[in-house]
């Protein structure tokens, strides 16, 4: 099993026991697969932007989504864009490239993302975006690193020389993401 698949399996397995509230539905009786080939298919797609949701699975009491994200180079000294997600935790597993991930702290000019946008409807639910004034934490990240970002915590990348690409596993206790979603390139 390659490193990407092993990392994804480990993160999903750990999160499958995540605490939840609200609904009390029965979890699925079968596992959901996302193969290394699936990840590469979505990564290599010519369209789809920097945040590409692969699947959203209804786990009963909560949803879990898995996406792959890519951030391009940042300009030294440029303002750092900050985003938070009101309901969804994100677990990043870096698969290639590197950069500095900023989290928490203070943000200027925060505004809600459009409710009808794909990022809100499919990827992360209600979210806000602004510019970092002062981050609470900074850390260099590269292949193999995992970072867990709670709901409401602003985050963004800087010091990206070429790119940073990562898998994001998103526990969704409020069912704001569309259960059953499958990236169009992965529908069989």
Predicted regions and their residues:
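A short hydrophobic beta-strand segment most commonly corresponding to one strand
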Residues: 162-180
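His/acidic/aromatic-lined binding-pocket segments of jelly-roll/cupin-type domains
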Residues: 82-83, 89-93, 138-139, 146-147
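Bacterial N-terminal signal peptides that target proteins for export
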Residues: 1-8
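Conserved metal-binding segment of the jelly-roll/cupin
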Residues: 139-161
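Short alpha-helix capping/helix-loop boundary micro-motifs
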Residues: 132-136
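Short, conserved beta-strand element in jelly-roll/cupin
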Residues: 86-101, 105, 114-129
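Hydrophobic h-region of N-terminal signal peptides that target proteins for export
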Residues: 10-19
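A short, N-terminal "cap"/entry segment at the start of jelly-roll beta-barrel domains
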Residues: 20-86, 181-188
């Amino acid at each position: 099993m390659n490193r990407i698949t092993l990392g994804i399996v480990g993160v999903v397995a750990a999160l499958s026991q995540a605490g939840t509230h609200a609904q009390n539905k029965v979890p699925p009786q079968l596992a959901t697969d996302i193969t290394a080939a699936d990840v590469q298919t979505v990564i290599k797609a010519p369209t789809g932007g920097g945040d590409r949701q692969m699947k959203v699975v209804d786990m009963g009491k909560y949803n879990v989504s898995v996406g792959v994200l890519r951030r391009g180079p940042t300009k030294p000294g440029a303002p750092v864009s900050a985003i938070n997600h009101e309901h969804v935790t994100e677990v990043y597993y870096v698969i290639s490239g590197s950069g500095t991930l900023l989290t928490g702290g203070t943000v200027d000019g925060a505004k809600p993302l459009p409710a009808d946008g794909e990022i809100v409807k499919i990827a992360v639910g209600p979210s806000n975006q602004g510019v970092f004034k002062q981050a609470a934490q900074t850390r260099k990240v590269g292949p193999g690193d995992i970072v867990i970002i709670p709901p409401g915590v602003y985050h963004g990348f800087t010091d990206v020389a070429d790119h940073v690409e990562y898998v994001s596993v998103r526990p969704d206790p409020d069912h704001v993401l569309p259960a059953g979603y499958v990236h169009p390139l992965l529908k069989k």
